[in-house]
């Protein structure tokens, strides 16, 4: 069985997480990581152990996930610091979202019944895991951005939790964001979908200086930021908030209040009709900036956005919220190319650690590609994974064969052939 070796650049990146594993568990990290990145099909432990550089039984590899010594908070901190250090970040754009992974079997830890709104061919209920992910948005070029994950948590339904252990998605996310604030003192901006735009999350991060950019409910009941002037001698208690505003649908129909703005979203430069104003939202108990956008070519395409940072302009709000799409691309990569939803794990530790290692490998691969191919870093993840596979197989074949004229060229041809075969698979 071919036993591949890790490249020096990837070894240095992986070694940044050394403190998260014990002395006995650490050798299994590299032994599992490289086969994981090279495999194109089902990533079973039996298959990965055969390609690992560590000569241990398959049972030892299974025990690494279920019984090995991991320090998950330390691993999350190492991933976070690696991203901040590599890209020299002075301010953070954090994107938050959750994704569903279908599972079969009642004895798998953390599973539950969830409604999948994007399921094909039609929305419906699935049985599986619900993962909450935090990632840092990094600008790869003038138009492209990439989300690098550094934290992942499992949401468990209330009926599957012991008394006193249940936490909502918003509580889990708020606790993780408090850890981010403890690690980074600079400005932090959070991007999230409309499902996280409520006081249970915003109220938890308000005191630590994290602002939110999200989608606004179309039925949100907004009011004027400040109450109007009272007439002299008026009776009753002074109003705390302003008068109610019209419905958002009515505000969106007022054409005179919109102006044309050119924005850069989703790798394109487009012209939108934009309207912005400040309003008090009782659901958050604070004043927010509301941005309404309309497509001049498609009048029915209307979006309602908001931010808790009143200093942001309308263009910044629109372009920031467009960067939230990077985490959707991350979920696609994690499932289709890294096997997040095809894990053969059942116990509590194995389930959580498998997902954590999957996200860590994505971040390590992205950082490796940035260091080795900085000018082409905006390419899709599949291209970066192909580069890593080609270089790994080339170095492995060249190191295992005789030194002769043309041996490096032959090794490179074998590496490219392996990459083409795994890409097709």
Give residue spans per PLM region.
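A short, flexible helix-boundary coil/loop motif
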Residues: 1-28, 36-37, 140-156, 165-166, ...
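Short amphipathic alpha-helical "interface-anchor" segments enriched in bulky aromatics
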Residues: 100, 313-345
């Amino acid at each position: 069985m071919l036993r591949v070796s890790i490249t020096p650049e990837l070894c240095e990146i992986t070694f940044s997480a050394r403190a998260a594993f014990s002395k006995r568990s650490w050798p299994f990290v590299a032994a599992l990581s490289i086969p994981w990145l090279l495999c194109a099909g089902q990533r079973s432990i039996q298959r990965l152990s055969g390609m690992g550089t560590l000569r241990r039984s398959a049972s030892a590899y299974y025990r690494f996930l279920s019984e090995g010594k991991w320090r998950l908070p330390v691993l999350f901190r190492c991933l976070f610091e690696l991203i901040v250090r590599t890209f020299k970040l002075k301010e953070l754009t954090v994107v938050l979202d959750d994704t569903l992974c279908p599972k079969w079997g009642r004895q798998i830890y953390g599973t539950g019944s969830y409604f999948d709104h994007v399921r094909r061919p039609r929305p419906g209920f699935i049985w599986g895991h619900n993962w909450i992910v935090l990632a840092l948005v990094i600008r790869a070029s003038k138009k492209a951005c990439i989300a690098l994950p550094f934290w992942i948590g499992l949401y468990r339904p209330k009926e599957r939790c012991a008394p006193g252990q249940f936490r909502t998605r918003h509580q889990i996310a708020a606790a993780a964001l408090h850890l981010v604030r403890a690690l980074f003192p600079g400005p932090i901006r959070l991007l999230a979908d409309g499902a996280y735009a409520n006081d249970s999350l915003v109220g938890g991060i308000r005191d630590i200086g994290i602002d939110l950019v999200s989608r606004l409910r179309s039925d949100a009941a907004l009011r004027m930021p400040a109450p109007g002037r009272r007439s002299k001698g008026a009776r009753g208690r002074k109003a705390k908030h302003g008068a109610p505003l019209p419905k958002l649908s009515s505000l969106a129909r007022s054409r005179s209040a919109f102006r044309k703005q050119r924005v850069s979203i989703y790798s394109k430069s487009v012209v939108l009709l934009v309207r912005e104003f400040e309003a008090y939202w009782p659901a958050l108990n604070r004043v927010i900036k509301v941005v309404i956008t309309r497509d001049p070519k498609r009048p029915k395409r209307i979006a309602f956005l908001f931010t808790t940072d009143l200093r942001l302009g309308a263009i910044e709000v629109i372009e920031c919220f467009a960067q939230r799409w990077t985490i959707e691309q991350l979920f696609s990569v994690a499932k289709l190319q890294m096997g997040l939803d095809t894990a053969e794990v059942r116990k509590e530790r194995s389930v959580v650690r498998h997902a954590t290692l999957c996200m860590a490998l994505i971040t390590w691969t992205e950082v490796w590609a940035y260091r080795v191919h900085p000018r082409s870093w905006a390419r899709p993840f599949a291209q970066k994974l192909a580069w890593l596979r080609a270089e790994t197989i080339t170095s492995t074949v060249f190191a295992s064969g005789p030194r002769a004229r043309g041996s490096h060229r032959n090794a490179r041809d074998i590496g490219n052939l392996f990459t083409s075969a795994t890409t097709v698979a």
